[in-house]
Amino acid sequence: MRVLHVYKTYYPDTYGGIEQVIYQLSQGCARRGIAADVFTFSPDKETGPVAYEDHRVIYNKQLFEIASTPFSLKALKRFKQIKDDYDIINYHFPFPFMDMLHLSARPDARTVVTYHSDIVKQKRLMKLYQPLQERFLASVDCIVASSPNYVASSQTLKKYQDKTVVIPFGLEQHDVQHDSQRVAHWRETVGDNFFLFVGAFRYYKGLHILLDAAERSRLPVVIVGGGPLEAEVRREAQQRGLSNVVFTGMLNDEDKYILFQLCRGVVFPSHLRSEAFGITLLEGARFARPLISCEIGTGTSFINQDKVSGCVIPPNDSQALVEAMNELWNNEETSNRYGENSRRRFEEMFTADHMIDAYVNLYTTLLESKS
């Protein structure tokens, strides 16, 4: 079996949650004897297929970009040339140019859409794009959502429930022993009792809510990551005089995992539906940390269950966030219980092996139905 994943960006150009899912699937398939390639776009290179660990990547140099969507006329031709080399083509939605790739090439392979998120922000462009989106989603064989919560709340997915299945995203188990000097460095830098945010600085991440809660509570907060709003968020923290907030910038996995181990709990204040799942919540659960997230009708509340693995609060409510942080800060027994439950739920539902096995079973079923 040969599988092709299609998405707008990939390692090492970007390291977002969708890229992480594609990486896990590609590596996991390779371990199971299934060849996996990634068809993606880059601002500065056109090459491939090139080896990336145990899978391969095909990079297409983008010609221009509109609304965070890269376009390439050469990619249309290239996709048509290679489409018949694969048994399964797994598209990762949303990426509007991908719809054009599919509909122009009409591959004979079985087609799967991993539906990461509704399109939330570009409402005006959505009116132009919607007919193309509907043709694309109607034409594929199967749609995979990451949580039943998202299937129930997505107006788009309601139209395709007859071919939509749920496969939660997963992460590898983590048994790495950390370098004692790095642990000592971070313990000296940020302590070992703080609330941890990890993620891109984007409009839907709720960072303004987190800064407001940090100002009200004066509890220690460590913010890991970067992105389009980084300068704005750092400036706001400085203007508020938030000495209890530490920005680390982007970190490698080892340093990030040390902070997960040192923190009191994970805060995930995303307040808009653009946050479809929440890989950071899985990372926190993997390290048996209590979680704080918002009820936005997506996978965040599938991962984090209120009063079981942490606190689920109303979105865009900094006072509710303060109260949740205080609950974990002032009640160590409760905090530990939530953390144990989050780890148990991770092991039962959210490991990479669970996800990969489910996808391989889906691929196999689709191929058997074709024959």
Curated annotation (Swiss-Prot):
<dbReference type="GO" id="GO:0016757">
    <property type="term" value="F:glycosyltransferase activity"/>
</dbReference>
<dbReference type="InterPro" id="IPR001296">
    <property type="entry name" value="Glyco_trans_1"/>
</dbReference>
<protein>
    <recommendedName>
        <fullName>O-antigen chain mannosyltransferase C</fullName>
        <ecNumber>2.4.1.348</ecNumber>
    </recommendedName>
</protein>
<comment type="pathway">
    <text>Bacterial outer membrane biogenesis; LPS O-antigen biosynthesis.</text>
</comment>
<dbReference type="GO" id="GO:0009243">
    <property type="term" value="P:O antigen biosynthetic process"/>
</dbReference>
<dbReference type="InterPro" id="IPR050194">
    <property type="entry name" value="Glycosyltransferase_grp1"/>
</dbReference>
<keyword id="KW-0448">Lipopolysaccharide biosynthesis</keyword>
<dbReference type="Pfam" id="PF00534">
    <property type="entry name" value="Glycos_transf_1"/>
</dbReference>
<dbReference type="InterPro" id="IPR028098">
    <property type="entry name" value="Glyco_trans_4-like_N"/>
</dbReference>
<comment type="function">
    <text>Mannosyltransferase involved in the biosynthesis of the repeat unit of the lipopolysaccharide (LPS) O-antigen region. Catalyzes the transfer of a single alpha-(1-&gt;3)-linked mannose residue to the acceptor N-acetyl-glucosaminyl-diphospho-undecaprenol during the synthesis of the adapter region.</text>
</comment>
<comment type="similarity">
    <text>Belongs to the glycosyltransferase group 1 family. Glycosyltransferase 4 subfamily.</text>
</comment>
<keyword id="KW-0808">Transferase</keyword>
<keyword id="KW-0328">Glycosyltransferase</keyword>
<dbReference type="Pfam" id="PF13439">
    <property type="entry name" value="Glyco_transf_4"/>
</dbReference>
